[in-house]
């Protein structure tokens, strides 16, 4: 499929030794990742505990988000590029989600990382919806922001038709990235916009100026590879 492709690869590591090794690789592999042929915007990120959204790090799960010129190149690089092969060789399991951008609002580190596909940015029949949010939290507001997370996690656990979710970040406490995959856009909208903890936290964040930067992006899921929690994602 022509056009830009965004990938999110999640790796799970078991055992203290493998987790310590992977923590070290987060520093060692930054330059090798940047030298990967055809890679555009990219981030290596850790994840949180609970359902993934809490600020306390989960040293067992690490992720790579990357932008590629096409889905074909994305598939080839996430299978064979040195960083992916190195992480995969040590991981208990890994899975990659392939996406095309529908919409993007805001910036990430001063960059506009995702380019919406053409023509009209809408889901095609059979495509699932992925949503990514990213925020830089003001240090003085971090406590207020993170205090809302447990209630949001409880609501997400009860949400209809959410197929995958993970919380990530570059710096614990100060950066939060949320990612989720939904069967239908209507179910995502019901979770995000209906009265409840997520809506209340979002309203307070913008009304009270909790963030120095924020981004919201929607994607069409066009494929997946690998296994997660013992099963193929099936996207």
What do the PLM-derived regions correspond to, one by one?
Residues 1-61, 71-77, 89-177, 186-194, ...:
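Short S/T/G/P-rich N-terminal loop/turn motif that feeds into the first structured element of a domain
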Residues 200-210:
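C-terminal end-helix/capping segment
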